[in-house]
A protein has these predicted regions:
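Conserved N-terminal subdomain of the carbohydrate kinase-like
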Residues: 48-102
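Glycine-rich phosphate/adenosyl-contacting loop at the front of the ribokinase-like
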Residues: 1-56, 65
Length: 102
């Protein structure tokens, strides 16, 4: 069993856009909302390969239930320590030509 610790987890959103126009209005389709953060990403990779893992993470109170549901769906054992504040989020824009902007 490998235990991972994530002190700064994130809610990672990936949005597909045809092309990115700086200073303009960009519309896209939400492709995915995934749990992230270094330790969470390691636990996700380990679980995908069938290894036993246990994720320990500190989440803002509002994100803790969401993380719990997502990690349960991925069959990742976990302990979530609730903290004040909100959980960090990241947005990735993926253009049709393969360019990625974070």
């Amino acid at each position: 069993m490998i235990i991972t610790v994530t002190t700064n987890p994130s809610i990672d959103r990936t949005i597909a856009v045809n092309s990115l126009t700086l200073g303009g209005v960009n519309r896209g389709d939400l492709n995915a909302i995934d749990p992230g953060g270094k330790g969470v990403n390691v636990s996700r990779a380990l679980a995908a390969y069938g290894a036993k893992t246990h994720a320990v993470l500190i989440c803002g109170d509002l994100g803790s239930q969401w993380f719990g549901k997502k990690l349960n769906a991925l069959n990742i054992a976990h302990n979530i320590i609730k903290a004040e504040g909100i959980t960090r989020s990241n947005i990735t824009l993926q253009e049709a030509n393969g360019t990625v902007t974070k």
